[in-house]
From Swiss-Prot:
Pfam families: 60KD_IMP
GO process terms (BP): protein insertion into membrane; protein transport
Lipidation (N-palmitoyl cysteine): 19
Lineage of the species this protein comes from: Bacteria, Bacillati, Bacillota, Bacilli, Bacillales
Protein name listed in UniProt: Membrane protein insertase MisCB
Membrane topology: Multi-pass membrane protein
Subcellular location: Cell membrane
Alphabetical keyword list: Cell membrane, Chaperone, Lipoprotein, Membrane, Palmitate, Protein transport, Signal, Transmembrane, Transmembrane helix, Transport
Organism: Bacillus subtilis (strain 168)
Chief location bin: membrane
Amino acid sequence: MLKTYQKLLAMGIFLIVLCSGNAAFAATNQVGGLSNVGFFHDYLIEPFSALLKGVAGLFHGEYGLSIILVTIIVRIVVLPLFVNQFKKQRIFQEKMAVIKPQVDSIQVKLKKTKDPEKQKELQMEMMKLYQEHNINPLAMGCLPMLIQSPIMIGLYYAIRSTPEIASHSFLWFSLGQSDILMSLSAGIMYFVQAYIAQKLSAKYSAVPQNPAAQQSAKLMVFIFPVMMTIFSLNVPAALPLYWFTSGLFLTVQNIVLQMTHHKSKKTAALTESVK
């Protein structure tokens, strides 16, 4: 359930950024032309824009390569937030797996009873169970996502509002014009990312997902990439390039985190058995 809320929050942020971005693009029909005032512009967009120009300058004006490298740099900077959240999720899941029979029993009783007093008593029993096992569902939260979102949004708008990008090309496409192949590449990459994330989660999760949650996860695997492709077709190709790079990084990141955690658990179990 918590992961579902986090995915919905991420999708909500993504929609807000893209909708506002599409409005700006409709007004300018090019990269650039966004407002040059405000705290967000001065402390996030402008520094990222300067970084994009600086990196491009190191590679003879290759803004496509600059977008790729800056995206990777930013993803590495926010990586500790992901790692911290990932570890908390795994610890939470492992603790929940231990108390799952008791939790299921309480939830069954909650569904059956209509008495408010009995419901309150069962809820208190659930809270006591959490406290006994040092479980705090609220401690997971979405804070890491909320912290990194302004950073990633800042980079998004920096790519949009850096006019030099529009006049350059990368590989086969112009960065300032929409490109069907690049749009499809971004959509496919996010499908691959979501698909792998779902498979790894199902494989390594300590708590089996209920059928409803599994169905919801499968639906999101298809919805998000379709949305990504549609939006990508209506923006300059510089943005799908950014999304493709970000999606590829997240895919590799997820694989490494999941496999590293699984390997460390196996090592710990073997060490414990030797003792």
